[in-house]
């Protein structure tokens, strides 16, 4: 029973875990379908991140609701970085069914010009727009 509790505890931490995305799986991840049908698909946020700018990464990702969150290292995801015209890190892109919906780009000071509430509001708008 003790081991079962430990396993359940570890699994619960993984539910909010942030996953990394690479060029190899980028398109499949932003086009992910959930098990409950198209109307239940959550938007996907990809944060383009740079190790040299670790101080300015988006740390509040676990507080976002109704979204799947991935982080992409710009040194590893050069094809995706080029395709989506990412020039600054951090950059957050919200996708819905593989379509780019909203972009939050860092400024020249390499800080994200949006806070948690701005990003959550954009997620909510994407979710509402896809309901019919």
Where does each model-flagged region fall?
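Short acidic active-site motifs
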Residues: 32-33, 76-80
């Amino acid at each position: 029973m003790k081991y079962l509790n430990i396993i359940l505890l570890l699994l619960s931490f993984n539910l909010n875990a942030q996953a990394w995305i690479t060029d190899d799986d980028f398109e499949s991840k932003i086009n992910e379908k959930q098990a409950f049908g198209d109307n239940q698909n959550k938007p996907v946020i990809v944060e383009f991140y740079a190790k040299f700018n670790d101080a300015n990464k988006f740390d509040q990702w676990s507080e976002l609701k109704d979204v799947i969150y991935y982080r992409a290292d710009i040194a590893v995801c050069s094809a995706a970085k080029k395709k989506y015209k990412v020039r600054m890190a951090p950059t957050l892109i919200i996708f819905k069914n593989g379509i780019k919906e909203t972009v939050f780009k860092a400024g020249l000071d390499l800080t994200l010009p949006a806070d948690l509430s701005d990003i959550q509001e954009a997620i909510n708008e994407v979710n509402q727009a896809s309901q019919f």
